Regions:
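Positively charged n-region of N-terminal signal peptides that target proteins for export
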Residues: 1-4
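Short linear motifs at secondary-structure transitions and domain/linker junctions
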Residues: 12-13, 23-31, 71-79
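N-terminal secretory-pathway/extracellular module detecting exported/lumenal segments
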Residues: 20-65, 105-106, 111-114
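Polar/charged, Gly/Pro-rich intrinsically disordered segments
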Residues: 93-120
Length: 120
């Protein structure tokens, strides 16, 4: 029985991951495919709380990308206005800063990736 649990669990996890990815696609003015990755909230400090909304945007890639930095900037403003602001809770400490980040590939938060194209 245990032999079946691992493959079934993997299939279920992949199915759930696909469903989540499909649900988190966000429309932006440039029309590029943008997927919400996660939200990172810093602890309150002297500057207040910072909330980071991280998105995957493969079309900003240096090699083969089709979205210019100017178009990405407009997309980031739209993501702030239409995605991030509505999701900021009305209770608890309000953020002093909201950061929208786009990356052409998955990058672990806080780690550098010299091959990734990222806009903040």
């Amino acid at each position: 029985m245990r032999r079946w649990c691992m493959p079934c669990g993997c299939v279920l996890a992949l199915a759930l991951a696909s469903a989540v990815a499909a649900e988190t696609a966000v429309e932006v003015p440039s029309g590029q495919a943008v997927i919400w990755v996660d939200t990172v909230q810093d602890s309150p400090g002297p500057g207040g709380v910072t909330v980071r909304f991280r998105f995957l945007a493969p079309a900003i890639a240096r090699a083969g990308g089709t979205v210019t930095p100017e178009a990405a900037q407009a997309d980031m403003q739209a993501l702030c206005d239409g995605f991030a602001l509505p999701r900021i809770a009305n209770t608890g400490p309000q953020p002093s800063q909201i950061v929208i980040s786009l990356s052409d590939r998955p990058v672990e938060f806080g780690l550098p990736d010299p091959y990734a194209t990222q806009f903040f």
